Amino acid sequence: VAVLSGIKNALREHLAKPSQLYWLLTTININLSNDLPIYNINGCSLHFYKFLPKKYRKARESIISEMASWLINKDDSSSYYITARVREKSEYDAATRMLDAIDLLRGIWNLHINKTMVFSFGGRKKPINQVTLGALHTLHDKNGDKASNTFWYDPEHYENHSHVDFAVNAYKTIEFTKNVRKLLKKNSYGKDVEIAIIRYVRALDSQDYDAVVIKLWSILEYLTATLQENYDKTIKRTVFQYSDREYNKQVLEHLRQYRNRSVHLRSGGNDIETHVFQLKSYVEHLLRFHIANHFKFDSLQESAMFMDLQPDKVALKKQIALCRAGISFMTKA
């Protein structure tokens, strides 16, 4: 009882707090030759700068200088700076919302430009994502001063990632982003799809490919609404999307076995890149299916019912006839 009372009091105090504006500052590896628009995503305003805005300079440099040189390097002057702004009751809630908004945008970009297959020849693996954030994220107030002594640092950050140039992208990533955001806005379960996109981009930030396999399989379960189901159901619903179902069933069964080995043994074999990119392709296919939502499903669960249908036209026509007979019977009853 005392514990519950304490939780209720803490919640009451949190809700009573006045909201205030927070700014999160980080870097992103977009080539400075690109002109990026302002994005408003889920109540967060995202702005891009080719140079570090003066009001943040003192606080940002102070944080970097306080850390050991081996931990945090100076900002990359050839990368864009990005600020996110949101009104929230706490630093943690603000940072969480802003990073979610940034990663949703990055997820859409990477869904469009990530490569279908890349092989590395020895050495350290690099993230599959093309668009990545810098290692350091700092929180600021309206004057640019530190809003908190807390900062966010990615110890796995890959330093040598090349810069992305949307200007040479023949497929027009900015236009793709507009279209995806319009579709998500119209989608009845768009917020669920956004969660999947954020999970997708965070999974592919990692250089630990065994961890990537585990995370991608979890996203596959999420997108097929099989988190509480067995593996067979996950595979069955995924292969419904493909004409060559038997082949894809075998591939997914192999990936499932590899995923299980990764959980227990951290296999990291020579073929791990192939497995990562195969699994990534299934996740991306399902993401695009849910983003478009051509059949106007109301939820992930309803889309899962669609994927449970028999992939057989004759059987489906019989099912339709039975449903019509049932409606006729109920009408007469």
Predicted feature locations:
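Generic structural signal for hydrophobic core residues of well-folded globular domains
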Residues: A203, Q207, L220-L227, L286, ...
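Composition- and surface-driven signal marking solvent-exposed, interaction-prone regions
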Residues: R199, L216, D232-R237, G268, ...
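Charged, non-catalytic interaction/linker regions at domain boundaries
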Residues: V1-A211, H294-A333
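Short runs of predominantly hydrophobic/aromatic residues within well-ordered alpha helices
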Residues: V193-A196, V212-L216, L220, N248, ...
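Flexible secondary-structure boundary motifs
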Residues: V213-E246
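Short amphipathic C-terminal alpha-helix that caps PH/PH-like domains
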Residues: M98-W109, L220, L279-I291
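Histidine-centered, metal-coordinating catalytic motifs and their short helical/loop contexts
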Residues: E246-F277, S281-R288
